[in-house]
Amino acid sequence: LFELIGLGALIGLLLALRISPVRAVIYAWNPLLLVEGWGSGHLDAMVVPAVVGAMWASVAGRHALAGGLLAAGTLLKLYPAALLPLLLGPATLPVLGAFAAGLVLGYAPVASGGLSVLGSLPRYLVEEYFNPGLLRSVVDFPGIEAAALTVWVLWMGLCRREAPLPARALPVIGGVLLLSPNLFPWYALWLVPVLAAVPSLPWIAFTGTLAMAYTFFLQDPWAIPWWARAVEAAPLAAGAGWWLYRRWPLDALAERSA
């Protein structure tokens, strides 16, 4: 049901951006969605309608609704809050007001539970070690990861403010995924609808190679083999290499070094 609602919201967003709704196929037939959403029923599939709906509302100028929908997504999973800076601007007050009100209304019934409302978040940040993100693979310290993620989200909120909202959302979501302490495949579900509006071959391929994380169970003790990690990261590594080549061609670098 939520996948269908998300599809409807995505079509609305594409039409609002004057993009062919046929692009929604990138979302509807993405293997990651079919396996982790339709097949496994992960809660993250419920986040998609809220996130896409928030972007659609923002593009349509319904800023309070955008803030409220983003709050709904944040109540389900915390990571949609990373998109909040993208919704700010001339309509900052309606967005922040609706976002804050949504969080208060959502958490008020369980406020007596104290920190228990955070669920498994502390364990996720400190104890679990499954398919670690880019930074944690090098430096395993939660404080650094949280700081890097905060800086990235705020910086992206200030960059390219004239670009369409999905184009700005793509690097934010990508950064959140790569800087996450643990990258479970279903955590990338909210990336897929954005790829329908802003197609990116490396990121689309990455939603497929994320399945390599399940090789975690092939070894004893459980761990993702190095070759599986390499395959998983290959699309993004290739995309980064191509971007660098386009930005600084080899012949230009040779001329500078001469």
Segments and roles (model prediction):
Residues 1-52, 91-175, 180-184, 248-258:
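Primarily membrane-embedded glycan-assembly and transfer machineries that use lipid-linked glycans
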Residues 199-258:
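Aromatic-enriched
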Residues 44, 82, 185-211:
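Hydrophobic/aromatic-rich transmembrane helices and adjacent perimembrane loops
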Residues 13-16, 71, 87, 176-180, ...:
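Short basic/hydrophobic patches in alpha-helices and adjacent helix-turn junctions
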Residues 34-37, 53-54, 64-88, 171-178:
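Membrane-interface alpha helices of multi-pass inner-membrane proteins
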Residues 19-20, 60-65, 90-95, 160-165, ...:
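Membrane-helix interface "capping/anchor" motifs
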Residues 40-44, 180-191, 219-229:
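Membrane-interface catalytic loops of GT-C/OST-like multi-pass glycosylation enzymes that act
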Residues 26, 42, 68-72, 85, ...:
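Hydrophobic residues within alpha-helical transmembrane segments
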